[in-house]
UniProtKB/Swiss-Prot annotation:
Keyword annotations: ATP-binding, Ligase, Nucleotide-binding, One-carbon metabolism
Protein's name according to its UniProt entry: Formate--tetrahydrofolate ligase
Lineage: Bacteria, Bacillati, Bacillota, Bacilli, Lactobacillales
Species this protein is from: Lactobacillus delbrueckii subsp. bulgaricus (strain ATCC 11842 / DSM 20081 / BCRC 10696 / JCM 1002 / NBRC 13953 / NCIMB 11778 / NCTC 12712 / WDCM 00102 / Lb 14)
CDD domains (alphabetical): FTHFS
GO biological process, one term: tetrahydrofolate interconversion
Length: 559
């Protein structure tokens, strides 16, 4: 009988977290333990690492457009990282985002890898972990409560209740909270106004946590967060209300990177979790930077496909990290590419070379998008049991015909042994890497130019169309002097377009911009397209229905 992911994780022989830390030259004095198998790294160790003069190679892991069939990007990141560390004997750290509990109990499930390529303790990482998500949710909702109290207690600056732009947050998928009215009833209950909730991972405070370099930077960024506008339409920021210290205090511990291990005891930093469709989609700057100072190779996974997390890492995050990736991995699967052609999961287990050829257009777009940055690229095929030799041979030949190296990886079933060839190739590419990155846009471009360049170069759109609301917001941002900030485009993860049903590699379409939101503390503008939601709902059969716990406290059903 095939073991489930959680059964494999629960049967693992974990090392004490102090032993995992020792692999990186960290002592028990450098850690703030959360039990036996996880810890935060303290500021003393972080500052010492920054002074050691060492900087490892950075490998970005991205993928094709996600599908219900699953791509296994986290599994590939962990498997290849394990192989570099254990098969090649090179000091390696894996850097991943923290899972959000919303998808864990919803449709997507967890984000700790799969099979014999997982980070552990799997249940903790997918649920409460070290409490970072709870700290963020508390900070988000305390900020909103303080703002509403400010209005209730006199509102000296004349903050217009109808122009509050910050939202409340929850780490729960709950569609009923997308639009609410607060303060109903008597004046004793506060000022009545419309409000909204968004998923914690999509809130600006999550982005700030992932971009801050230390507590001083964290506090400064929180102070810059736009709260709303006055009755005279003047912007009001958190620092104008004096709340930045309290909110930073709530996040000061969450800012420290979390250290765990893989099933094969490779060190892993799992820290920060912004979604790539509604935010910037990459783990924290602090954890990646720490990993680079403590190891020779760092694998960092970007959310969703190369058009989302990958593009945002290369155009934005790497500028804040002040390091470009030395190489990139693009993950693909036979069954996901067949889905791009068939648009159904009904027959994905059956051999279909024609569907694979047609669906290859999606991978072709993604791998060429990444190569357009001049970065060396390895394409890996995550092999599934239903893949036929004919399908694997065809896909590998299609990839190599485009001039890309390709390796088939079986880490899900075999652990690091199944990723050795991919590890050897990506290390070779990273070691030889010497290129000048060609980003999608120049930082000096205005917002419209940045949006157009990403839309045309990465999505292959023909045109960009703005609603009247979006046009007004562009004017306001220019008036505020914020029209040169980087852009984070919020778009469906399932398509290069803003239409979830347009699969494959469409061209000649129009990207529809519905609105622009200033994330002043994070230092970017979110560009909303199509019908993207920042508070998901639950499916008809949520994953929660399959999760249980027995009388000993042993959890089952997580994946």
């Amino acid at each position: 009988m095939v073991k489930s992911d959680i059964e494999i994780a629960q049967a693992a022989e974990e090392l004490p977290i102090t032993d995992v830390a020792a692999k990186l030259g960290l002592t028990s004095q450098d850690l703030e333990p959360y039990g036996y198998d996880k810890a935060k790294v303290n500021w003393q160790a972080i500052k010492r690492s920054e002074e050691n003069g060492h900087l490892g190679k950075l490998i970005l892991v991205t993928s094709i457009s996600p599908t219900p069939a699953g791509e296994g990007k986290s599994t590939m990141t962990i498997g290849i990282g394990d192989a570099i560390n254990n098969q090649l004997g090179k000091k390696t750290v894996i850097a991943l985002r923290e899972p959000s509990m919303g998808p864990v109990f919803g449709m997507k499930g967890g984000a700790a890898g799969g099979g014999y390529a997982q980070v552990i303790p799997m249940e903790d990482i997918n649920l409460h972990f070290t409490g970072d998500m709870h700290a963020l949710t508390s900070a988000i909702d305390n900020l909103s409560a303080l703002v509403d109290n400010y209005i209730y207690q006199g509102n000296e600056l004349g903050l217009d209740p109808e122009k509050i732009v910050i939202k409340r947050g929850l780490d729960v998928n709950d569609r009923t909270l997308r639009k609410v009215t607060i303060g109903q009833g008597s004046k004793f209950n506060g000022v009545e106004r419309p409000a909204s909730f968004q998923l914690t991972v999509g809130h600006e405070l999550m982005a700030i946590l992932c971009l801050s370099k230390d507590i001083a930077d964290l506090k400064e960024r929180i102070g810059k967060v736009l709260v709303g506008y006055t009755y005279e339409d003047e912007p009001v920021f958190v620092k104008d209300l004096g709340f930045q210290g309290a909110i930073a205090a709530l996040l000061s511990t969450a800012l420290k990177p979390n250290l765990v291990q893989t099933l094969e005891h490779t060190p892993a930093f799992v820290h920060g979790g912004p979604f790539a469709n509604i935010a910037h989609g990459n783990n924290s700057i602090l954890s990646t930077n720490l990993a680079l100072h403590l190891s020779d190779y760092v694998l960092s996974e970007a959310g969703f496909g190369s058009d989302l997390g990958g593009q945002k890492f290369l155009d934005f995050v790497s500028t804040k990290l002040e390091k470009k990736p030395d190489a990139a991995v693009v993950v693909a699967t036979v069954r996901a590419l067949k889905y791009q052609a068939e648009k159904s999961t009904d027959h994905l287990k059956e051999e279909n070379l024609d569907s694979l050829k047609e669906g290859f257009a999606n991978l072709d777009r993604h791998m060429n998008n990444v190569r357009s940055y001049n970065i060396p690229v390895l394409v890996v095929i995550n092999k599934f049991p239903t893949d036929t030799e004919a399908e694997l041979d065809l896909l590998k030949s299609l990839i190599e015909e485009q001039g890309f190296p390709c390796e088939i990886v079986t880490a899900h079933d075999e652990g690091s042994k199944g990723a050795k060839a991919a590890a050897e190739k990506i290390v070779e590419l990273a070691d030889k890497s010497d290129y000048e990155i060609k980003r999608s846009y120049d930082l000096d471009d205005d917002l419209e130019t940045k949006i157009e360049k990403v839309a045309k170069r990465i999505y292959h759109a023909a045109d960009v169309e703005y609603t009247d609301k979006a046009k007004d917001q562009l004017v306001k941002l220019k008036k505020m002097g914020k029209d040169k900030l980087p852009v984070i485009i919020a778009k469906t993860q399932y398509s290069f377009t803003d239409n979830v049903k347009e699969l494959g590699a469409p061209t000649g379409f129009t990207l529809h911009v519905k609105g622009l939101s200033l994330r002043n503390g994070a230092g970017f503008v979110v560009v909303s397209t199509g019908h993207i939601l920042d508070m998901p709902g639950l499916p008809k059969h949520p994953a929660a229905l399959d999760i249980d716990v027995d009388e000993t406290g042993k959890i089952s059903g997580l994946f």
